[in-house]
Each structure stands twice: as C-alpha cells, then as structure tokens.
Amino acid sequence: SVRGIADEICITDTGSTDKTREIAQKYGTVQAFPWCDDFSAARNFSFAQARMDYTLWLDADDVLLPSDRQKLLALKAELDGTADVVMLPYHTGFDEQGRPTFFCYRERLLKTSAHFRWQGAVHECIVPRGNIRYGDAAVTHRKPPCAYSDRNLKIYENLLAKGEKLDARGSYYYARELLAHKRYAQAVEAFEAFLAMPDGWTENKIDACLGLSQALTALGEREQAKRALTRSFALEVPRSAVCCALAALEYADNRAR
C-alpha cells in the first residue's frame, strides 16, 4: 500500500524468523538490528538511516488505504520545509464493517534534520516540538489476529528488576499490560501509582480510571470500581466510555437486587 509514496524506504529487521527480510529486500534497504528489548532503540537506529527531508514511519502491520494514499501524496507535494512535525490520524479500532471507531493523532512525518528521538522501551513515542502541522491522511493499523503476547509485560518487568524507574507514560502502559494479563491486584496498584503522578497525560489518566475500574470489578470491588470511574470527572468533561461503564455497573447491580 506504500509502494511509490517514498523516495527511499529504510527497513529495520529486529530478528524475524519468517520471510519478512526476503520480502522487504524487494522494496528497499534492510538493516539488521539485534533485538535488545527496547523499541525506541530500534526505531532510533532506523531513523538514523533516513536521508530524505522528512521521515515517515510505519509498522509492518500498518497500511494506507487508497484514499489516504492519495491524501499523503498531496501532502508530500505541499510540504515546503517549514513544518517540523506532521500529525496524522492513526486508525486502531474498527466495527464489524471495518469502519474506524477509534483514532488518535500520531507524530507521523518528522523533519529529518531536526533529529527527533524516540523515547520509551515499550509503547515508544516522539515528543513533538517546533512547527507542528496536522493532516488528514490516515494510517490504518491492521494487526493480524493472534494470542495476546506477554512480550511487553516481560520488558517492563525486566526494567523494574534492574532497578529502573518507569516514567509516567511507561507506568500507564505497564498497568495496562497487567490488566490485560488478568493480574488484577497488581494492576490496581500500578494504576493508582500512575494516577498519583503529576505529569501523566490527561487522556491516559482518564483511561487509567477505566482500567482501574475494570480491575476492581474483576476483584469484586464494585463500589470502588464506580468511584474509580467518577475520579475521571475531576480531570475533564465526562467521557462517553466512562459514563457507559458506570451505567453498566449500576444496571448490573440493580438487576442483582
């Protein structure tokens, strides 16, 4: 889906055991990067190979739909070098018809000469700076169905075992990993620790209230689960997902009476 949109393609292989490397070599230079449990290190290595004015990053399971491909080509033609970062929609949730139900903006196009650096061993990101522009060419995440991996959780646990401290973003995603693996009591502790951090992003804190509520519900602490949801009201205007979760708890409790 990305053939022809870029002036060069830099592919970094972190140790695939299928035919990824052979297939990728047909489209651009493939650099090997020994896996070291650090996604930022791999991305920073890949970014160091880029030689064009702007660097666009995509994961192996990201695609451009035909309409978004045309939007990206039009955006590319418009770039005059004044933008340092171009934020583009990232579609990650879909309904049964394949229509996007959730998206966020990601730092998708970055000026190469600005030497942006990825941060975070897992769920890595680049902190946007400089002249930031928004576009409408969406990237679609098409993750193949598979069992939920414990890779990310192990990376976090290895970091903690080494005595490293997680920043706010890392603490948030660590709590989510614990929740996904049904380690509910630990998830409660991790979500509470994140919510106590002053520098956590508001959106992450709202989602943490949802995650905390889910963990408490699984532990049978339904009243605490409700209070966890209402804590998000002090952060921002009540979100629909939070209100629906609170209503679901109340409805279930009323039916049980």
Where are the language model's segments positioned?
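A conserved acidic beta->alpha catalytic loop
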Residues: 1, 13-22, 35, 59-62
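Catalytic-site signature of metal-activated, phosphate-bearing donor transferases
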Residues: 41-47, 58, 64-189
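Short aromatic/hydrophobic "clamp" motif used to bind/position activated sugar donors
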Residues: 55
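Short coil turns that delineate tetratricopeptide repeat
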Residues: 164-165, 199, 237
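Start-of-helix register in tetratricopeptide repeats
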Residues: 169, 203-207, 241
